[in-house]
């Protein structure tokens, strides 16, 4: 069991844990362990400023220890930033029309004018598995915002604005990384973190129960 200092959905330093196999090749972690919805009382939740950066910190810690495979559980996040925070932690920079650096959040999605990947250090030669039973795509009435946004604190009168921001973000990712992250089943998981892992980092989505069966030897 590894202890790591990361950040919660609102940028506060928190310690969390994840597991590394005895041979050091496999890391198993969960987004909810650092940016979980249940970590913040309902009356204090603000998904409009929440970021997935903490997940990126946790992933980078595992990579720094030499892990070649990461299984990451998607679900229960307090965020709806489309994984913008994860990408920023791996060196991707987002700027507005004034060339001002944007802090990852729902508010920032619609302001993105330019994405700079020149200094990005995305995972290479690493297998990433998303443990995810959710098949929802990033966008649409069955997407991240409309299906899961309410439980995170997004009000009904904010939904369309947030969805437009997410669609704009999706377009900017396509321009930068030449992939439509909305195409992937599960891209809407964990507030859209799935879109970055599956689309940009070329992860594989596997249902949670299938992983349990595989690693427990159950039939």
Predicted regions and their residues:
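N-terminal loops that bind phosphate or other acidic moieties
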Residues: 1-74, 78-219
């Amino acid at each position: 069991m590894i202890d790591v200092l990361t950040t919660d959905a609102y940028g506060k330093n928190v310690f969390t844990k994840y597991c590394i196999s005895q041979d050091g090749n496999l890391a198993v972690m969960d987004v909810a362990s650092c940016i979980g919805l249940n970590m913040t009382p309902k009356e204090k939740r603000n998904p409009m400023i929440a970021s997935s950066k903490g997940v990126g910190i946790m992933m980078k810690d595992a990579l720094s220890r030499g892990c070649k495979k990461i299984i990451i559980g998607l679900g229960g996040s307090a965020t709806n930033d489309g994984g913008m925070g994860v990408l920023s932690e791996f060196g991707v920079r987002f700027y507005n029309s004034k060339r001002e650096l944007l802090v990852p959040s729902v508010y920032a999605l619609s302001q993105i004018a330019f994405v700079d990947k020149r200094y990005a250090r995305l995972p290479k030669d690493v297998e990433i598995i998303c443990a995810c039973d959710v098949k929802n795509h990033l966008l649409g009435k069955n997407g991240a915002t409309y299906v899961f946004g309410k439980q995170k604190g997004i009000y009904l009168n904010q939904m369309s604005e947030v969805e437009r921001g997410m669609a704009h973000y999706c377009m900017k990712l396509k321009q930068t990384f030449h992939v439509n992250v909305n195409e992937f089943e599960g891209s809407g998981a964990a507030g859209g973190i799935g879109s970055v892992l599956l689309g940009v980092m070329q992860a594989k989505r596997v249902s949670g129960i299938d992983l349990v069966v595989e690693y427990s030897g159950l039939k």
